[in-house]
Amino acid sequence: SAASDVYKRQDEHHFNEDLQWEDAVPMFERLQKLADKQDLEFGLKLSNTFPVDTTRGELPNEEMYMSGRSLFPLTIEMCNRISRQFGGKMRISFAGGADYFNCDKLFAAGIWPITVATTILKPGGYNRLHQMVEKVEDMPYRAFSGNDPAAISDLAASALHDFHHLKPIKPLPSRKSKEQVPLLDLSLIHIS
């Protein structure tokens, strides 16, 4: 998968310095009990970005952050583990590679809110927001009563082989132009 490509190496210290599963589960249980007692809602946001080593001079420093489609398999697997651990009762907000190709499946599995960033930073990105809304707007919305561990497990398993999350064998041509972008005076543009 894209997440395991050779150039996306991570150092164990990222895992060792982060919250460990055996500490996280009891903490989440305590926080959920406290939220229930206070008549509040509690949930987890997964996962934002993931630090990986810079190995090919992509950036001037030693680290960069994985996001977008390559992060999806890791994030959905964490959702899978949390959903199973808590019997589908833990609220999960998703921010780890959500896009047009999976937003409906995430929503149907009871994972929401769904936030996106990487997909809209690409060419045509804001048009994708419209496409994503169209894809989920007719789906039934229901108040949270749990997520679907089986559906999340299926998403996690399929993410490992879904071509949307795999690096192409033949690299795509660069979309970047070598031309200098012209200056544009927006005050001269008339919008009617």
Language model features with spans:
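Active-site beta-loop-alpha junctions enriched in small/polar residues
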Residues: 1, 47-51, 95-99, 119
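Short, small-residue-biased leader/transition segments that mark boundaries at the very start
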Residues: 2-7, 191
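Alpha-helix-loop-beta-strand connector modules within alpha/beta enzyme cores
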Residues: 27-34, 67-88
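Structural preference for beta-strand elements that scaffold enzyme active sites
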Residues: 39-45, 89-93, 113
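Conserved, mostly hydrophobic/aromatic
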Residues: 44, 82, 106, 114
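Catalytic cores of alpha/beta
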Residues: 98-112
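Glycine-rich phosphate-binding active-site loops on the catalytic face of alpha/beta enzymes
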Residues: 109-131
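Ferredoxin-type iron-sulfur electron-transfer modules and their immediate structural context
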Residues: 127, 131, 138-192
